[in-house]
Amino acid sequence: MSLLSLDLSTKSSGWAVFDGNKLNDYGCITSSSTDLIKRIHIMTDGIKEILNKHNIEKIVVEEVRPDLGGSNLQTHRALMWLQASIAFLIHDEFNKVQIEYIYPSSWRAACGIKNGRGIRRESLKQYDVTFVKETFGIQVNDDIADAIGIGYSQINQVSNEINWE
């Protein structure tokens, strides 16, 4: 199965393509525009290019969740709009591709990265970069590291099925 994993942002979105258990390609789509809608178009167009280049069967996206207490509503809204833009792209042009969403705590746990109360976001980003360097032998920025971690969590899922044979 060919999998595209995404760590979405309207300024710098990390992505990774896995074919089976192999990391096949990765990168980052960036935009410095001050216009939010233009940034969303740039991100969506970049993802469309990746989908046209690779035969993707499934996309896994880091779920958007407002920070409890100190949430930045404007940022949350922008990320939700970006997710919607990608959902429309998939629906309209790549309708055989599945989209799934995963919470950061879930994919990090699957990668063996300790997270939860008391661990700062900045520390987690560095742990993600270190995980990718140790697991794949590559040095990447935190956006790409997150995308690779998201994909890794999917390709290394343990089956809970019981084999009765």
Task: Tell me the role of every PLM-derived stretch.
Residues 1-165:
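Phosphate- and other anionic-substrate recognition elements at nucleic-acid/protein interfaces
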